[in-house]
């Protein structure tokens, strides 16, 4: 994750802003600079290489002292920064909006995936600039639309029916902020269209998840798509979702947290997010993740959750 101010800076033209991507040498200069505390939140002028991000965001970049940041000296950083600028320059951002826009925290990996989709000549985003910009605006929180299959970050498609597409995320192969844990495995499920879904499509998805992905929990981050994650990473996702929800509420970026379909979401996660929306503390909410829930009546007749050991999927072992 990183703020948009880590990728570009605003330049006032008439009564709105144009956004310009940073270059890696300007960032490198900023990372070595001694800057007064009162200037930490201001864009840094490298004199030689142009404007650089505010020094307060130093930890967002990979250095000898910090291996958890972005690999900003890669060509992928330039591609992501340019893509963000193209999207922001396609809309009107005024003086009253600019600080709020640049402080928005976005998923670096999501944006790298959109670059990969854009570069794939078999992908619809390669052929449609309009759809590409729409996908980026959704990714950076500048659109109220949800991420559907056409505008999704992408990955490897492992399941699809008339209503849903399930993607295996490919973060292990990334350049900008790769996941280094070789055991990482995670999926995302997007809606093919933002419209009511038939019970038969939901039943098909639930059957697939229970049969092939019974070692995973189905959760949501509240943005209109599902995530399929290992049970061991549930607590980590809960911390992130809770922190983001509280930060958005504090900064006034209040967007409705979409709980999605209770028949698909893991029961404990649904309880956690419902409790969070009611204003409870993190500790109170997280207890619900590890509490034995009363088994709800199966909404789909004939779809059993019981499996013999030799029938259980080995995905995720």
Curated annotation (Swiss-Prot):
Its EC number is 3.6.4.-. Its cofactor is Mg(2+). Residues 205-241 are annotated as: RNA-binding. Keywords: ATP-binding, Host cytoplasm, Hydrolase, Magnesium, Metal-binding, Nucleotide-binding, RNA-binding. GO terms for cellular component: host cell cytoplasm. It is found in: Host cytoplasm. One of its GO terms (biological process) is viral genome replication. The keyword Hydrolase applies. The active site is at residue 225. Homooctamer. Interacts with VP1; this interaction is weak. Interacts with NSP5; this interaction leads to up-regulation of NSP5 phosphorylation and formation of viral factories. Interacts with host DCP1A, DCP1B, DDX6, EDC4 and EIF2S1/eIF2-alpha; these interactions are probably part of the sequestration of some host SGs and PBs proteins in viral factories. HAMAP family: ROTA_NSP2. This is Non-structural protein 2. The lineage of its organism: Viruses, Riboviria, Orthornavirae, Duplornaviricota, Resentoviricetes.
């Amino acid at each position: 994750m990183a703020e948009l101010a880590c990728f570009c800076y605003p330049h006032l033209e008439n009564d709105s802003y144009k956004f310009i991507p940073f270059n890696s040498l300007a960032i490198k200069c900023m990372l070595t600079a001694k800057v007064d505390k009162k200037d930490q939140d201001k864009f840094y002028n490298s004199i030689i290489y142009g404007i650089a991000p505010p020094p307060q965001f130093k930890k967002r970049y990979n250095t000898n002292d910090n291996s958890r940041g972005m690999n900003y000296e890669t060509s992928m950083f330039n591609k992501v920064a340019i893509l963000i600028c193209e999207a922001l320059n396609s809309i009107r951002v005024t003086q009253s909006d600019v600080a709020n826009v640049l402080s928005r925290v976005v998923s670096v990996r999501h944006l790298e995936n959109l670059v990969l989709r854009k570069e794939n000549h078999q992908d619809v985003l390669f052929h449609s600039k309009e759809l590409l910009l729409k996908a980026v605006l959704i990714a950076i929180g500048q659109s109220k639309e949800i991420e559907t299959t056409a505008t999704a970050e992408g990955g490897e498609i492992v399941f699809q029916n008339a209503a849903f597409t399930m993607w295996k995320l490919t973060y292990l192969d990334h350049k900008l902020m790769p996941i280094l844990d070789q055991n990482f495995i995670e999926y995302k499920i997007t809606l093919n269209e933002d419209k009511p879904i038939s019970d038969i499509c939901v039943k098909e998805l639930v059957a697939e998840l229970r049969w092939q992905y019974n070692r995973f929990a189905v959760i949501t981050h509240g943005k209109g798509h599902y995530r399929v994650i290992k049970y061991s990473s549930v607590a980590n996702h809960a911390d992130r979702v809770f922190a983001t929800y509280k930060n958005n509420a504090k900064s006034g970026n209040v967007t409705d947290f979409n709980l999605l379909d209770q028949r698909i979401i893991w029961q404990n996660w649904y309880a956690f997010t419902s409790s969070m929306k009611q204003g409870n503390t993190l500790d109170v909410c997280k207890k619900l993740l590890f509490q034995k829930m009363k088994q709800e009546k199966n909404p789909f007749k004939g779809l059993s959750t019981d499996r013999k050991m030799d029938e259980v999927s080995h995905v995720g072992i």
